[in-house]
Swiss-Prot record:
Keywords: DNA damage, DNA repair. HAMAP family: DNA_mis_repair. Pfam families: DNA_mis_repair, HATPase_c_3, MutL_C. InterPro entries: DNA_mismatch_repair_CS (IPR014762), DNA_mismatch_repair_MutL (IPR020667), DNA_mismatch_S5_2-like (IPR013507), HATPase_C_sf (IPR036890), MutL/Mlh/PMS (IPR002099), MutL/Mlh/Pms-like (IPR038973), MutL_C (IPR014790), MutL_C_dimsub (IPR042120). Disulfide bonds: none annotated. Residues 354-374 are annotated as: Disordered. The keyword Transcription regulation does not apply. It comes from the Bacteria. Disruption phenotype: Double mutS-mutL deletion strain have 40-60 times greater spontaneous mutation rate. Cells lacking this gene have an 80-fold increased spontaneous mutation frequency. A double mutS/mutL and a triple mutS/mutL/nth disruption have a 200 to 280-fold increased spontaneous mutation frequency. GO terms for cellular component: mismatch repair complex. Belongs to the DNA mismatch repair MutL/HexB family. The lineage of its organism: Bacteria, Bacillati, Bacillota, Bacilli, Bacillales. This is DNA mismatch repair protein MutL.
Length: 627
């Protein structure tokens, strides 16, 4: 039998590095979080070959004294917790004392640090061992350069992705940290080219604009709700701004960005029926709570956390998002064709947010688009050479905002620059009926789209989607009735299933009855339906009952709330006006009046838009009546 031995510190650090340092992005995350814990206000990150060749992080934080600097590269050495009680009230981003020794054990590392009092310290390490020590300048702060990452762990290096993928991971990490800490000016460069720069003024809206662009930032709404245990703040994109993945949904708890599926689920439920299937919103959710309610000591990466009172937090976020959208008019405006301009790629863009814009004469202003929660004034200047546009890092003042990304040149001449604060003050809750303007029908297109107008322009309404929304809200109430009014069928319906399917149906008969499907056994693996709720769509009963049963058969876990929801959606779709159905004027007027009375009149239950708006100004611009 093999003997039990004590592993060396060098081997222990390599084992720990397997969890802490998964890829270059992990190194960047740990070093930047250390800089933030050191009260830095400016952080500069320089990357070569997506971090595999070199990672440099420079900050103006507190720095370290000579002995502390050497001690920091020993396992479980930290200045952030001192006893067991501190572990349950962690307020810093780091606390385990594993990051620096783990990074040093799989790389060549140089650190230069000073507290600003006397000479600083410079250490050079290879594979976790200090090979040289010297004095350095007394500039306050810390500079760490990590090179030849994974030089002594070729297996890990073998599984690195392409430069593009690894750089994307680094950018994602830095973006989320920048959102969590808008008070810190962060600059990220790859081979000398800026990928991100924030101004550190504490306004997360400027960070959102730097990451996603001003066009998206204009269409993000503020969120702020609280309870006795939680305060939730952030920004959520209007439903028209969606992405194909969840990567654009950021969650922060007590300044630490995390990955938590229940929080993602809460956000999606807040957007319920406003998003198309398979699409996800852009959101930034910042949660503040007592540290004792969150356990961050779950995994060395500290991305996963355990939250106490998770259900309460889930409901707070979901209901808060729903309340935000109840106050908005969510009719998207059609885009006016613009002169084609090439996208500007891989060049530095300077975006200025004017807090007090100068007075200027504005051309005739367009009718305000329906989606205008906040206004950003932006000036896109001509790109300049990298050497000119990237001044050396200054610690006495945060650098200006400049963002390298693909930007489309937008026509902003028709917008009067205003501050975020002015725009936010303009937001007022609107009664449900006032969110949809009064429109006067003028006809139909292909028996599918209703055309209506008012003083603000032309509205195009999808008649099927409109009635689908109306019927969905009706059926959603009906399907939850405890004792629905039933109607006997003249000719009962029979259904036949396999043995396995029949076992599932028997197990979930009660759930099926709760949505109006009343099954009686009718021989081996067969069922008969003799009645159904009176409000079932006429002529669609058999197909609807079969689809609801199939929904139960296809689901691994039956959620009665979700089953009722799906049933209401199916009923509304089957019972609504189909395409190529020509309506009379009075039918159109009744449909629009009913739509105005719904709680969410802007999207169908599947998340597709119901109304599109062409403003009078947009129409005139398309016909060149205005330039």
């Amino acid at each position: 039998m093999a003997k039990v031995i004590q592993l060396s510190d060098e081997l222990s650090n390599k084992i720990a590095a397997g969890e802490v340092v998964e890829r270059p992005a992990s190194v960047v995350k740990e070093l930047v979080e250390n800089a933030i814990d050191a009260d830095s206000t400016v952080i500069e990150i320089d990357i070569e070959e997506a971090g595999l060749a070199s990672i440099r992080v420079l900050d103006n934080g507190e720095g370290m004294e000579n002995e502390d600097c050497k001690r920091a590269f020993r396992r479980h050495a930290t200045s952030k917790i001192k006893d067991e009680n501190d572990l349950f009230r962690v307020r810093t981003l780091g606390f385990r004392g594993e990051a620096l020794p783990s990074i040093a054990s799989v790389s060549h590392l140089e650190i230069t640090t000073s507290t600003g009092e006397g000479a600083g310290t410079k250490l050079v390490l290879q594979g976790g061992n200090i090979i040289s020590e010297s004095r350095s300048s007394s500039r306050k702060g810390t500079e760490i350069v990590v090179s030849n990452l994974f030089f002594n762990t070729p297996a890990r290096l073998k599984y690195m992705k392409t430069v593009h993928t690894e750089l994307g991971n680094i950018t994602d990490v830095v973006n989320r940290i920048a959102l969590a800490h808008p008070e810190v000016s962060i600059r990220l460069r790859h081979h000398g080219k800026n990928l991100l720069q924030t101004n550190g003024n504490g306004d997360v809206r400027h960070v959102l604009a730097a990451i996603y662009g001003t066009a998206v930032a204009k269409k993000m709404l503020p969120l702020h709700v609280s309870s006795l245990d939680f305060e939730v703040k952030g920004y959520i994109a209007l439903p028209e701004i969606t992405r194909a993945s969840r990567n654009y949904m950021s969650s922060v708890v007590n300044g630490r960005y995390i990955k938590n599926f229940p929080l993602v689920k809460a956000v999606h439920e807040g957007y319920h029926t406003l998003l198309p299937i398979g699409r996800h919103p852009i959101t930034f959710i910042e949660i503040t709570m007592d540290p004792i309610l969150v356990d961050v000591n779950v995994h060395p990466s500290k991305l996963e956390v355990r939250l106490s009172k998770e259900t309460e937090l889930h409901d707070l976020i979901r209901d808060g998002i729903k309340d935000v959208f109840k106050q908005q008019q969510l009719i998207p405006s059609a885009q006016v064709p613009k002169k084609s301009a090439p996208a500007i790629k891989n060049e530095q863009q300077f975006i200025t947010f004017d807090e007090k814009p100068p007075e200027k004469k504005v051309p005739e202003k367009s009718t305000a688009p329906s989606y205008s929660p906040m206004k950003l004034s932006s000036v896109v200047k001509e790109p300049v050479d990298a050497e000119e546009k990237l001044p050396p890092l200054q610690f006495d003042a945060p650098p200006i905002v400049d963002q390298e990304q693909t930007l489309e040149v937008s026509d902003v001449s028709a917008e009067q620059p205003e501050t975020f604060e002015q725009e936010c003050h303009e937001e007022q809750p609107q009664p449900a009926s006032d969110r949809v303007p009064i429109m006067y029908p003028i006809g139909q297109m292909h028996g599918t789209y209703i055309l209506a107008q008012n003083e603000n322009g032309l509205y195009i309404i999808d008649q099927h989607a409109a009635q689908e929304r109306i019927k969905y809200e009706y059926f959603r109430e009906k399907v939850g009735e405890v004792e629905p009014e039933v109607q006997e069928m003249i000719v009962p319906l029979t259904f036949h299933y396999s043995t396995n399917e029949a076992l599932i149906i028997e197990q979930h008969k009660q759930e099926l009855e709760s949505v109006g499907v009343f099954l009686e056994s009718f021989g081996s693996n067969s069922y008969i339906v003799r009645c159904h709720p009176a409000w079932f769509p006429k002529g669609e009963e058999a197909e609807l009952i079969e689809e609801i049963i199939q929904q139960v058969l296809d689901s691994k876990n039956i959620d009665i709330k979700k089953l009722r929801e799906e049933a209401a959606i199916m009923m509304s779709c089957k019972g609504s006006i189909k395409a190529n159905r020509h309506l009379r004027n009075d039918e159109i007027k009744a449909l629009l009046d009913d739509l105005r009375s719904t709680s969410d009149p802007f999207t169908c239950p599947h998340g597709r838009p119901i109304i599109i708006h062409h403003s009078t100004y947009e129409m005139e611009k398309m016909f060149k009546r205005v330039m």
